[in-house]
Amino acid sequence: MXXXXGYLEFDGARQQSFLYPLFFREYIYVLAYDHGLNRLNRNRSIFFENVDYEKKYSSLIVKRLILRMYEQNRLIIPSKDLNQNHFFGHTSLFYYQMISVLFAVIVEIPFSLRLGSSFEGKQFKKSYNLQSIHSIFPFLEDKLSHFNYVLDVVIPYPIHLEILVQTLRYRVKDASSLHFFRFCLYEYCNWKDFSIKKKSILNPRFFLFLYNSHVCEYESIFFFLRKRSSHLRSTSYEVLFERILFYGKIQHFLKVFINSFPAILGLLKDPFIHYVRYHGRCILATKDTPLLMNKWKYYFVNLCQCYFSVWFQSQKVNINQLSKDNLEFLGYLSSLRLNPLVVRSQMLENSFLIDNVRIKLDSKIPISSIIGSLAKDKFCNVLGHPISKAVWTDSSDSDILNRFVRISRNISHYYSGSSNKKNLYRIKYILRLCCVKTLARKHKSTVRAFLKRLGSGLLEEFLTGEDQVLSLIFPRSYYASKRLYRVRIWYLDILYLNDLVNHE
């Protein structure tokens, strides 16, 4: 991002409209190409001259695209002719895929610069740890154990594409870019296909950015109003939702509040709430009563529905009591567990026992969901009985073994934070036996005869890398007593959900 900022040194008069000219500069396409190579799950092929023959960046394709954007009349092609109309040997859809990738990279630049400036002066031990999915679990273990209720919300998509354009309009003041963006979005994006999927017509990263920017907008409003929640019943705040002038009205509201409203207007105690958003969901955790939790549910849902045109389904907004209900969170089932502790205390000649109760966040593996995912991918049946993977029998033995080992290690790595690893061993057993059945089927043999011929050493590859490393870190007595299997370990290098972990 620091290297990209060097290309964007414009004077103050041009900073409001610097996006649109970037579409006609070749070095921006090089930046988008290089940015895509350094990230996972990117559509790299759109910058390649011939995907099947030679994977290299083609400046010729970029020049053709820029030339075509200059010729505005040729740019407007009916949607039904996306795949039929060719321009210099490429379909129209191909060029609009390039534009979607480029637009995502360009629009991310001002947002990333603004985000980076917000972290200035703040100290983080290791900034890259914040990118890990597992980094959120230690935070929840420390915070959720003190709370009673959690509001679990599935965040819906906007009901119309124009809402996303309006969201960007509040941040990006470049009218030319927004008109160009609106044209591409309406002409070449079918609403039925508007979802963040790998098989989306346009770049998934493009829609991820639009979705996150829209969610951040109503989150910023909610956080501001939540801080002033004790005074909202006596203060008219509807005028704040004129979105263009909202951030200016915040300052005006604060001045009026300080000068005109005494502190005694706070009829309700301002509750302490933690808000976490993850993977299309969000949770609000608090120690309030059920009545106040329903208040916040009504408050949050109506804010989003009335002012941001997103419709929440009632069955996807739930209030869970952590001591009784399980919270589905990033592939784990989390709940509060009471651990009774007996402490023996002795003062002089008198001794007595003290009963303490420790509240602990319990993270479990959703075994039913994982078995359902394994059954869907033909690793086992719906009851969890391993079956052979017939579609892999054409591969070599080493390739088959490596595939199963990789899946087993990925699942073990992700669920290393489980408080009870018994279900994890069951999953590893299913994959291990499925691997043996697949190899036996390939060699037209039975499982018993195949293992007798090759020996049990074949399955030693399933020993996870974590087991090998942890056996060297922890004392031998500690490792031999198998207490290590009850230890929860959170890794800070997990940046995405494995397909078998994501069950939705």
From Swiss-Prot:
Its main location: plastid. It is found in: Plastid, Chloroplast. One of its GO terms (cellular component) is chloroplast. One of its GO terms (biological process) is RNA splicing. Pfam families: Intron_maturas2, MatK_N. InterPro entries: Domain_X (IPR024937), Maturase_MatK (IPR002866), Maturase_MatK_N (IPR024942). Keywords: Chloroplast, mRNA processing, Plastid, RNA-binding, tRNA processing. This is Maturase K. It comes from Rorippa palustris.
